[in-house]
Amino acid sequence: RCLASGSSGNCFYLGNHKQGILIDAGISARTIQKHLRSMGLDYANIMGVLITHDHADHIRAVGTLGERVHLPIFASRLIHEGINRNYGVQEKLRTSQRYYNVGEEWELMGMKINTFAVSHDSTQCVGYVIDYQGQRFMIATDCGEPNAEMEAYIRTANHIVIEANHDEQMLLNGPYP
């Protein structure tokens, strides 16, 4: 379920009526909680937060979620370093940082999770492929241009979320791919 998408913030929920994960936390912790409550859930039902990249509209609430709510924050080492360098939340995330290697499969609450590179102007940007309850979910945010790995995952996914903004002036005048 999409809780928010766009330049003002990104956050997605994947799970069932008992437990799940968040993908990105680019809106306030209070707004996330409001969305969770509308689904009959609370932070106790969230097993972790998967981060796609280190821009503010994807990580706004990670400091609060890590420090106060004690949710594990999953990202590659490069993404965590970018978050710490750019937003100064290293102390808040000290006990909640969890690392994965891009391209290596790992598991969380019965979800098989893999990552792939996404073209974007951040420290590192990843998309997620999640196999859960016989379904394959693929999510990629802020896509600059597709790559072969993303296209292969699109062909095998049952559910696809691709988030991208198109602004011709930004493309013509900015460093975007």
Language-model features: locations:
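Active-site neighborhood of phospho(di)ester-bond hydrolases with catalytic His/Asp-centered motifs
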Residues: I23-G26, I46-D54, F74-R77, M138-T141, ...
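Active-site glycine-rich loop that binds ribose-phosphate moieties when present
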Residues: T115, S122, I139-A148
